Amino acid sequence: MALILGITGSPRKGGNSEVLLEVFLKETVEATVKVEVFSVRDLKISPCLGCRFCEEKGFCKLSDQMGEIYALFKQADLVVISTPVFFYGFPAQLKALVDRSQALWSRRYKLGLRDPKSPWRKGVVLAVGATKGERLFLGIELSSKYFFDAIGAHFEGVIGAKGFDRPREVLGDEDFMYRLRQRAKELLFPLTRRKKVLFVCKHNACRSQMAQAFLEFYGGDRFEALSAGDDPWKEIHPMTFQLMAEKGLDLYFRKPKHIEDILEDAPFDLVVSMGCEVSCPMVPGKRFVQWDLEDPIGKPIEVGREVRDLIEKKVKELLEGV
């Protein structure tokens, strides 16, 4: 299922920005999607040091909860930020999260790596301010534009409410609430129409990971791609990162999954077995395909490149055939 990631940026509990997110996410009840929500005030996120470490290494040197957030950004199909306006910008807690996304910007623009979901991921901001200034949301719009670009998402704009200060006061604006619900439906609807494809191999450490990434990159608007294995490793094989980096795709924040972890997404429209040396688990699906691909792990990198290119070709053929 598609993942909707909701982020509340207010340092205050129960305020208007939380109400906006609640109303927006109510539209997911009837949609077949997953929802995960967190408040930045509950996280320990240090401010960016401006040290440029991420520009050289591709990851942040600071060790805190931001590491978990990076992974969530990469899993999400839609990122929704709900925030109050503080001096025409984000509150400090949310600004720290935005600044720390420099690490993802570095992976894209310094290392030349694209997240496979980035062509299709979307981001939107719900904002509420106590005043009614003509340019009340200008600062947030500019920051959001570059933040969403950094995490690999198309910025869908700010849905803003002006003149609300008391907790939950914004609920009284019925016209705004209607517009908010309608925009939520518009953003959620395409995610519920995609066909689900599962790629399966034994360890979910190489072939199935590459297939998932290629389908996400080339056809993420029409397909929801997943991958899993019946004996998953703890980490993706290092060669897989190298092979996909040669194609400009970034798998750094991904982990192998057990087949049981994705059964909640069943049934699948298509299940593709990559070529199991032992026995791949059976999962609920409408159609099953066997690709019989060689396992490149433990073999020369040239073998890995041949398998990778064959997977890419097969994914493109799959897209052309639908």
Language-model-derived ranges and their functions:
Residues 52-75, 240-266, 270-280:
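Short, structured active-site "lid" loops
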Residues 93-107, 145, 262-263, 270, ...:
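A short, gly/pro- and small-residue-rich
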Residues 126-133, 163-167, 280-322:
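Phosphate-binding/catalytic loops
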Residues 1-106, 174-196, 210, 250:
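N-terminal beta1-alpha1-beta2 submodule of the flavodoxin-like/Rossmannoid cofactor-binding fold
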Residues 109-154, 310, 314:
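Short, glycine-/small-residue-rich phosphate/pyrophosphate-handling segment
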Residues 138-194:
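Glycine-rich phosphate/pyrophosphate-binding loop and the adjoining helix
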Residues 8, 39, 159-160, 229, ...:
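Residue-level recognition of beta-strand->loop/alpha-helix junctions
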